[in-house]
């Protein structure tokens, strides 16, 4: 019987090389499929948030508001001293003056808290312990391309923000969801530019000096409410004292992952912008419940109109 010879070294190397080439060809395709699935999940998350806002509108007669800063009255007595510190300011974690009615007690909390009953999270909504709520991770709040749904800095987070309009100034009411007390709650009839022409929620850009770190924001998704954690704008940013404006690039930007944040001349850039970890663009859910993508460098004027609910202008171009 003639024995079959084994692989020679050259034959083995050729087989290994062929396998390596096949892996090299297939890996990008697998990565594209994974990213497409992540982008679809992100789109579905936005659809759910849009539907939740609509259900909230049907129940209450208006969209949720964006809440207030932690140091806005009424202030919990435990943080009065901190709020007097100019370096503490609006970036404090919010507390609330205790009352017996949870929704009233948490009126300065973010829109994300008030949509909880409409995304099958009513058990979190009715939880009486504030700390437990602040640490309740909601998967719908997370884009799988951006970060995992888990606690960061011992707080629950969110990767989506409400459309606050042209800026995050306290007095601004040009968007759909803005600071509680700045104006009356927004109703469908207030969106005179058309619900199919106005952004409701969009993906958030990462704060650039936090690239390569475990989290990009320092507070819970639920409190304080009026904060860049849960609201973003089209045009201007706020300095840390909440008053001075900083011009932005007028549109969403891509989060290009880097490990050296020192290359950025302005680490605060991205603090109040929309943006995305997807390569194809930033996704928004509109006030009519539809989801659309916006490229990273849209026409500045058109994008500003897209974030304004009643300026009487037409979206007369592709962005």
Named regions from a protein language model:
Residues 3-42, 48:
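N-terminal single-pass transmembrane signal-anchor helix
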């Amino acid at each position: 019987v003639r024995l079959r010879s084994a692989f020679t070294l050259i034959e083995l190397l050729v087989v290994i090389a062929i396998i390596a080439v096949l892996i090299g060809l297939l890996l990008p395709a697998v990565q594209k499929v994974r990213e497409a699935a992540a982008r679809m999940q992100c789109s579905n998350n936005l659809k759910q948030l849009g539907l939740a806002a609509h259900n909230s509108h049907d129940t209450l007669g208006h969209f949720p508001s964006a809440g207030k800063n932690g140091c806005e009255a009424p202030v919990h007595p435990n943080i009065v001293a901190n709020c007097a510190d100019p370096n503490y300011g609006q970036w404090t974690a919010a507390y609330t003056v205790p009352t017996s009615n949870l929704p009233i007690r948490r009126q300065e909390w973010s829109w994300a808290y008030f949509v909880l009953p409409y995304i099958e999270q009513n058990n979190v909504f009715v939880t009486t312990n504030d700390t437990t709520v602040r640490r309740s991770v909601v998967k719908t709040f997370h884009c799988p391309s951006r970060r995992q749904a888990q606690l960061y800095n011992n707080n629950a987070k969110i990767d989506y923000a409400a459309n606050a309009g042209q800026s995050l100034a306290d007095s601004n009411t040009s968007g759909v969801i803005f600071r509680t007390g700045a104006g009356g709650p927004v109703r469908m009839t207030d969106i005179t530019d058309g619900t199919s022409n106005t952004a409701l929620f969009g993906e958030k850009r990462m704060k650039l000096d936090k690239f390569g770190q475990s989290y990009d924001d320092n507070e819970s998704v639920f409190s304080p409410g009026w904060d860049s954690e849960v609201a973003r704008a089209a045009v201007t940013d706020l300095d840390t004292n909440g008053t001075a404006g900083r011009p932005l690039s007028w549109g969403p930007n891509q989060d290009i992952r880097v490990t050296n944040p020192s290359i950025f001349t302005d680490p605060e850039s991205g603090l109040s912008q929309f943006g995305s970890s997807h390569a194809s663009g930033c996704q928004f859910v509109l006030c009519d419940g539809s989801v659309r993508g916006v490229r990273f460098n849209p026409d500045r004027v058109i994008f500003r109109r897209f974030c304004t609910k009643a300026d009487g202008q037409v979206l007369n171009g592709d962005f």
